[in-house]
Regions:
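Glycine-rich adenosine-cofactor-binding loop
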Residues: 162, 218-225, 309-314, 321, ...
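NAD(P)-binding Rossmann-fold cofactor-contacting core
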Residues: 18, 356-377
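Active-site beta->alpha loop and helix N-cap motifs at the rims of alpha/beta catalytic domains
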Residues: 1-115, 129, 136
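Phosphate/diphosphate ligand-binding glycine-rich loop within oxidoreductases
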Residues: 215-327
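Adenosine-phosphate binding glycine-rich loop
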Residues: 330, 334, 419-422, 426-486
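Rossmann-like adenosine-cofactor binding region
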Residues: 375-446
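Catalytic alpha/beta core domains of metabolic enzymes, predominantly
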Residues: 84-216
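Glycine/small-residue-rich loop that forms an oxyanion/phosphate-binding "nest" at active or ligand-binding sites
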Residues: 37, 44-90, 279-332
Length: 486
């Protein structure tokens, strides 16, 4: 009870309503309830969820009803009652003046089909509920679409969303589709259902209070997406530019059905990450010419319903290097560039630099991949073992060597680094890799991967909105976040 009192206090600073989960309070006594309800500075929903509906209450039904009754008698504005209780219990609470009834249905294994959702809603609304609550579980990201279209068709105040990581977007978009409320945890680790975001994340990352029916949607397509910095960066840009839009994480397994299904939401733009950068090309209406040569898309723009693919990894890397050279009045044209790596990042960087007239050499551990990329670029390639004879003006690391946690690894022998060489590392975690440290000691100019990472996001934002992104602010966010993960 003591801990609950503290939590009520904290919750009052974040939330519009507080759900008091009586089933989460150990050994709760009926007499404690009045103390808890009286402490509220916000309207309260009293819930005492039994195990059968996914809660923790294992006591008798009489005790459960007694706890809820004491809560409503003490002034709880809402009481949440499960759909499968005796109708007489619902009627009992309906007679209590000043208390509204939420009749709830939970499905922890799937999202019911459209017709079934309507049927459940009709049944719950028929009990005389003030608010109907239908909570499903998302097995696929497209399950959220059923919830959105269902919400748009109901008249009774209704709470509806999907649980689970794949259902998080339905919690964030609750105000857009008219859900009566959305639940958030008090802090990370205090979730009362799978997929719940913390209140601070909902408010500070997703700008929840700004979301309404007219809010545009952007998002990141990938798998996994849970640790991406994209939502923080893009939602910061959207807020600072005063745009009515939100950027969401889309964890996508089946890409074709996602792209097709989400057309109904008219998503304004996507970032694309592993593992979908190549496969998405075949699902778009148009590709930027640079994308056709690189063979990968990291950005999609919705232009009047047509999806157009771009690659800002490429343009961002080129800009970072050009800006680095420009400090000494230099340009890329005719420069000798060695790229270590032949994966997705190397392809994007190499094609961008080639367009600017650089002379490129590819070096990669798996020689056949170096040969293929060099063939596509019509440039030279070398064996990994030949790196000790390096003769280049610009050296770029596009491998994951040196990336957290293997921070002592270096992609080239340190003695090949010469004064005046420009060394760019695409790795951004950590920002200062061993390669960059050794390069600085030997008098090279250095550029880190954070600049590219921030710029590729900023260029996406510009492609979507036509507005410049707040670059310095974004760079600060990324560097602070990365400093916290070391
Ligand atoms: P990828 O497609 O998987 O390619 C990985 C590359 O690293 C391949 O060339 C691979 O060589 C090489 N590699 C990996 N481990 C190695 C090792 N132990 N020894 C030698 N070579 C090794 O990955 P990617 O998407 O190109 O990403 C590469 C790096 O760039 C990652 O660290 C990523 O974080 C970074 N990146 C940064 C940005 C940014 O905005 N700053 C953007 C994109 C990527 P093999 O061909 O022999 O396997």
């Amino acid at each position: 009870t003591e801990e609950a009192l503290q939590d009520i206090n904290t919750a009052s600073e974040l939330a519009d309503l507080i759900e008091l989960r009586l089933d989460y309070i150990n050994n709760i006594k009926v007499s404690d309830i009045e103390t808890l309800i009286k402490a509220k500075a916000r309207p309260v929903i009293a819930t005492c969820r039994p195990k059968r509906e996914g809660g923790r209450f294992t006591g008798s039904e009489d005790k459960r009803v007694a706890l809820l009754e004491r809560a409503t008698d003490s002034g709880a504005e809402y009481v949440d009652i499960e759909h499968d209780v005796e109708r007489s219990l619902i009627n009992k609470f309906r007679k209590k003046a000043g208390t509204k009834i939420i009749v709830s249905y939970h499905n922890f294994s799937e999202t019911p089909a459209d017709a079934e959702l309507k049927e459940i809603h009709q049944k719950l609304a028929g009990t005389g509920a003030d608010v109907v609550k239908i909570v499903a579980f998302a097995r696929n990201i497209t399950d959220n679409l059923r919830i959105f279209s269902f919400l748009e068709g109901v008249r009774t105040p209704t709470i509806a969303f999907c649980m689970g990581e794949l259902g998080q977007i339905s919690r964030i978009l609750a105000p857009k589709y008219g859900s009566f409320l959305s639940f958030a945890s008090l802090e990370k680790g205090k979730e009362s259902a799978p997929g719940q975001l913390s209140a601070k994340e909902l408010l500070n990352v997703y700008n929840f209070r700004r979301i309404n029916r007219a809010t545009d949607i952007y998002g990141l397509i990938g798998n996994p997406v849970a640790h991406s910095m994209g939502p923080l960066l893009h939602n910061t840009c959207l807020r600072e530019e005063g745009l009515n839009a939100v950027y969401l994480p889309f964890k996508v397994e089946d890409l074709p059905s996602f792209i097709n299904g989400f057309k109904t939401l008219n998503v304004r733009g996507y970032s694309v990450t592993i593992p979908h950068k190549v496969t998405i090309m075949g699902l778009l209406d148009k590709l930027d010419p640079l994308v056709e040569s690189i063979g990968a898309v990291n950005t999609v723009v919705n232009r009047d319903g047509k999806l157009v693919g771009y690659n800002t990894d490429s343009t961002a890397a080129v800009k970072v290097i050009e800006d680095g050279l420009a400090k000494d009045g230099d340009t890329l044209h005719g420069k000798k560039v060695t790229i270590v790596g032949a994966g997705g990042a190397a392809r994007a960087v190499a094609f961008g630099l080639k367009q600017k007239g650089a002379g490129i050499t590819i070096v990669n551990r798996t020689e056949s991949r170096a040969e293929t990329l060099a063939g596509d670029l019509k440039c030279q390639y070398k064996k990994f073992g030949e790196l000790d004879k390096l003769n280049t003006a610009i050296l770029i690391n596009c491998t994951s060597i040196g990336m957290h946690p293997n921070i002592d690894d270096i992609p080239v022998p340190a003695n090949v680094l010469r004064p005046g060489m420009l060394v760019f590392d695409a790795v951004y975690n950590p920002p200062e890799t061993r390669l960059l440290r050794e390069a600085a000691v030997r008098g090279c100019r250095t550029l880190d991967g954070v600049k590219m990472f921030v710029l590729q996001a900023a260029q996406q934002f510009e492609l979507w909105t036509g507005r410049p992104a707040p670059l310095e602010h974004l760079e600060r966010i990324v560097r602070t976040k990365l400093a916290g993960t070391q």
